[in-house]
């Protein structure tokens, strides 16, 4: 496994693989890796001959400077994890490599509509930062496939829309949310939880699961289910940002006869902001 830090170096590596007709996969990360990230790497290895994992803490997707500053940087530990998974290259660029014109002069890539609701409404500019850095990474590496997790469901839809709208020759693959045994979705931000908060954190998964099961049983008054979900979280000591039921394909508000839905929630528990979702697939509604 090689650690490459410059655009020229990683492009040179990719050019060599392409000359040998090898397929390249990219797994974009911000580091502080956990089992969820490693599952992405495993899937990427199934889809390509060479896997590149990028590690770059992207300031453009943080709307809170303190959040950016305290985001865990664990590069040495991340390297050890990835070395065991057959990764070909870890791409760890500097801020100047990714944004050579400095942050105040960056050319942004933004998906309108989808980027402004739910998570986008709570974290202004967040998705613009995500799509900008992903577009830059795609342009640098030009992978045939990139792998993302379904835990960040809205992000996944936005990246797929960006790729489709800009005719990027990249396949966007996803894997199901990786969870601990108690249901808590794995996240780098789980490290912010105290021991007591960690014990309560799976209540978020429970609230989503309850809503999903109730929908499967035929309940269609979604506003009541959303309020019930928020109240479950408040009662457990969470501070919810949102708890919504949306159409799975575009996150629009459902009309009541859709077959594919998703329940999405975000809530603070102490200093940790947890997000999760639960997809709901229904039989055809007569």
UniProtKB/Swiss-Prot annotation:
Pathway membership: Cofactor biosynthesis; (R)-pantothenate biosynthesis; (R)-pantothenate from (R)-pantoate and beta-alanine: step 1/1
GO cellular component, one term: cytosol
Main subcellular location: cytoplasm
Keywords, sorted A to Z: ATP-binding, Cytoplasm, Ligase, Nucleotide-binding, Pantothenate biosynthesis
Enzyme Commission number(s) of this protein: 6.3.2.1
Catalytic residues, chain numbering: 37
Amino-acid positions noted as binding ATP in the UniProt annotation, renumbered to this chain: 30-37, 149-152, 178, 186-189
Positions bound to beta-alanine: 61
Pfam families documented for this protein: Pantoate_ligase
Domain of life of the native organism: Bacteria
Residue positions binding (R)-pantoate: 61, 155
Annotated CDD domains: PanC
Compartment(s) of residence: Cytoplasm
Catalyzed reaction equations: (R)-pantoate + beta-alanine + ATP = (R)-pantothenate + AMP + diphosphate + H(+)
One Gene Ontology term from the biological process aspect of the record: pantothenate biosynthetic process
GO molecular function: ATP binding; pantoate-beta-alanine ligase activity
Database matches in NCBIfam families: cyt_tran_rel (TIGR00125), panC (TIGR00018)
Family note: Belongs to the pantothenate synthetase family.
Subunit structure, interactors included: Homodimer.
Additional information: The reaction proceeds by a bi uni uni bi ping pong mechanism.
The protein's name in its UniProt record: Pantothenate synthetase
Species this chain originates from: Nitrosococcus oceani (strain ATCC 19707 / BCRC 17464 / JCM 30415 / NCIMB 11848 / C-107)
Gene: panC
